[in-house]
């Protein structure tokens, strides 16, 4: 099964107890966040007026910078796909601060009377998942956004810098920042070529490009896993080692900082930097396939 998933799976859409209110939210690999936002523009909000995206925007007073989607932590079924195999994953839902989840009141009766009367949020959620699945399945070129991915990871390096500064170590993240900059530049080059390729479709070129794109996040995994948890192979995100639900970016480095091990932090930064460059090479392979 693992070999089949690595060879063929393009994404995993996770839906786990996510319809208990009226406020749209989601979490995903950064490469899939733009896909979720675009899907939200295509589905009517269950309470309206307008689309899910438009209601989301109004809730944030029109500030698109606040239309954030979270990063995946743990405690759900995406872990096997995302943390273990490096398959991009994401999920959406409609929630509310009701405190019912995983309680004795989490029942059909509560949901039908209070959580989602008429099951309107459930219907909108199913429509959103259908839009995402259709766009992933039918796209000439897989709709990953690696410009968004690289940009977000560059921003998250600041968390490493803060942790290193608190420890007063001389360990530098500059090599990782440079590698992520090269990655993002390669993603921008791919985006330019992608637009031209979609204007003149070529199925053989698209197949080669898609095969390369599927390797990008897989190349950010390590077969031997994290030092603390061998099953967790992804080096981009994991669940927090001290909180199974929270997310931890760059877990191999962050855990070394938490455990006060500067030599391991430096070694893990070098390993992560090399893997980012390997992921960039996959982007360059996709670009070359489309030229």
Regions found by a protein language model. Give the residues of each.
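Secretory-pathway/membrane protein signature
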Residues: 1-291
């Amino acid at each position: 099964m693992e070999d089949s998933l690595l060879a063929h799976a393009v994404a995993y859409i996770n839906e786990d107890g996510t319809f208990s209110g009226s406020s749209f939210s989601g979490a995903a690999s950064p490469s899939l966040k733009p896909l979720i936002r675009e899907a939200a523009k295509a589905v009517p909000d269950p309470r309206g007026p307008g689309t899910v995206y438009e209601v989301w925007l109004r809730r944030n007073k029109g500030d698109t910078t606040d239309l954030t989607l979270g990063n995946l932590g743990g405690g759900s079924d995406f872990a096997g796909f995302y943390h273990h195999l490096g398959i991009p994953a994401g999920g959406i839902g409609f929630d509310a601060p009701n405190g019912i989840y995983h309680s004795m009141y989490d029942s059909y009766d509560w949901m039908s009377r209070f959580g989602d009367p008429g099951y309107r949020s459930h219907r909108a959620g199913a429509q959103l998942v259908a839009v995402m699945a259709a766009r992933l399945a039918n796209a000439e070129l897989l709709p990953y956004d690696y410009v968004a991915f690289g940009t977000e990871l560059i921003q998250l390096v600041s968390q490493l810098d803060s942790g290193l500064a608190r420890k007063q170590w001389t360990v530098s993240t500059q090599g990782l920042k440079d590698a992520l900059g090269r990655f993002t530049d390669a993603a921008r080059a791919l985006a330019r070529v992608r637009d031209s390729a979609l204007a003149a479709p070529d199925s053989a070129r698209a197949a080669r490009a898609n095969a390369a794109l599927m390797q990008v996040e897989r190349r950010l995994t390590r077969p031997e896993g994290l030092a603390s948890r061998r099953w967790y192979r992804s080096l981009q995100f994991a669940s927090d080692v001290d909180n199974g639900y929270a997310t931890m970016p760059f877990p191999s480095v962050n855990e070394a900082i938490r455990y006060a091990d500067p030599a391991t932090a430096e070694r893990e930064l070098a390993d992560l930097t090399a893997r980012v460059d390997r992921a960039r090479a996959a982007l360059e392979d996709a670009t070359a396939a489309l030229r």
